[in-house]
Amino acid sequence: VFMADDMLGTGGTLLKGMETLKENGAKKVICSISLPLFSGNAISYFDEAYKAGLFYRIIGTNAVYQEEVLKREWYVSVNISRLFAQTISRLHQQQSLSSLLDNRDIIGKLLSADTPPS
């Protein structure tokens, strides 16, 4: 199961969602987070949840630097610096952001790469 959220604070809601998914038969849970803040004791809560098998990986962006979470086996950081740079440049030049935000081509390539030949 793939979960996506815009922001992770303490992670309580996300952890409850993972727990519910596992209780209902989910085999592997992967979460993608745009702004992984990991506030308060969130990292230790996710350490415990990972040990309990509630999720496989958390994928977060480097929009928020979290040195401690980068050490975790369960965390994958995705570099979005280029996207930010392109966004700033286009805004400065009063150009459209639509093509930056349209992921249909990327998703199509990923799906076709995973499709076995007939």
Model-found features: residue ranges?
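PRPP-associated nucleotide enzymes
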Residues: 1-118
